[in-house]
Each structure stands twice: as structure tokens, then as C-alpha cells.
Amino acid sequence: MSKRILVVEDQADNRRIIRDMLARTDYEITEAENGEGALAAIAKQRPDLILMDIQLPIMDGYTAVSRIKADPGLLSIPIIAVTSYALNGEEKKARAAGCDDYVPKPFSPRQLLAKIRQYMVR
């Protein structure tokens, strides 16, 4: 059975780029455009890992991560923040919200895959 990744990203082009980067893997990809969509997707099918953009419409990534991590049944899902806001303190804010890791945009396929594999082997 392949492992599932939920990609939460409001920009369709960025979702496509990530999907293309993961196309040669065995991961099953699900997508959401915002935090509310992420919560709905998780309720339908629990992912093994979440790639979460932080700057999202409707419900931002910080709020979505906090809600996910507040649920004891979802606490073990690794969440990697993926954001173009690579400012000082952004990684700290992401981790404080409950993200397990952080990848600043732009990133290479190699960098993203290495980060994903780090959590998928657990």
C-alpha cells in the first residue's frame, strides 16, 4: 500500500510543481487549496504526511496545523511547512504552531524528497 501525502497549497501552479516532483514516487497525492480544505481531506482519508503552505486563504496554515495537532488521533502525522516566507523567525513560528519541519520555497525536487523520506521511514 502506498503512503499518502496531503499537499495544502493555494496556488495551482505550485500544487502542480509539487505533484510533478512526486510523480515518480509511490506516494498517493491528495490536494487541498486552504486550511479548511485540508481538514476536510483529512476527515475523508488520513494522510501519512502533510506538506502545508502557511499563507493560505480562508484558514491559514498555522491555524490548520494547530487544529490538526490538537486532535490526539492526528498528532502523529508529520507536517512539513512549505512557504515562500523564509524570513527570520518564520521557521520558529511554524514549529511553534506544530509543524515538524520546514522547507523554504523555492526548493529542489531533491531537497523536498529528502525531507519527505526522512519522515516516511518512521
Please describe what each predicted stretch is.
Residues 16-24:
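Charged docking surfaces used in two-component/phosphorelay signaling
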Residues 9:
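Conserved acidic carboxylate
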Residues 45, 57, 75, 87, ...:
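The feature encodes the CheY-like receiver
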Residues 32-33, 56-59, 68, 77, ...:
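Hydrophobic residue at a beta-alpha junction
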Residues 107-116:
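C-terminal output helix
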Residues 31-49, 66, 92:
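Acidic, metal-coordinating helix/loop segments flanking the phosphotransfer/catalytic sites
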